[in-house]
């Protein structure tokens, strides 16, 4: 099992699929990485040499923001919005949908379980 960017990637899968187990690398970026390192698309992780794994590791470290660094940057962006007092920051602070979705009837995932209101019967 190869360890890239602090993540154990599965050995029996194709390299493009296995790289997507790393937070911050999706299908497009995984394809880009394999092209930069000149690895065929059908190659599996257990068929990679140590040199190829090292090349992949170096490419990801040099060119991409992944795992903890990416999570930290996203949380810092949200914190910045909240500190500025921007509308999006206020929505984050109140734990409501940020991107304009309606909240009258939906948004249960973001708002949490419905809280009963005493005396609210029809």
Swiss-Prot record:
Keyword annotations: Ribonucleoprotein, Ribosomal protein, RNA-binding, rRNA-binding, tRNA-binding
GO molecular function: rRNA binding; structural constituent of ribosome; tRNA binding
Alphabetical GO biological process terms: translation
Region (Disordered): 92-122
Source species, domain of life: Bacteria
Coiled coil, from the record: none
GO cellular component: a single term: cytosol
Family assignment from sequence similarity: Belongs to the universal ribosomal protein uS13 family.
Quaternary structure, from the entry: Part of the 30S ribosomal subunit. Forms a loose heterodimer with protein S19. Forms two bridges to the 50S subunit in the 70S ribosome.
Function: Located at the top of the head of the 30S subunit, it contacts several helices of the 16S rRNA. In the 70S ribosome it contacts the 23S rRNA (bridge B1a) and protein L5 of the 50S subunit (bridge B1b), connecting the 2 subunits; these bridges are implicated in subunit movement. Contacts the tRNAs in the A and P-sites.
Protein name: Small ribosomal subunit protein uS13
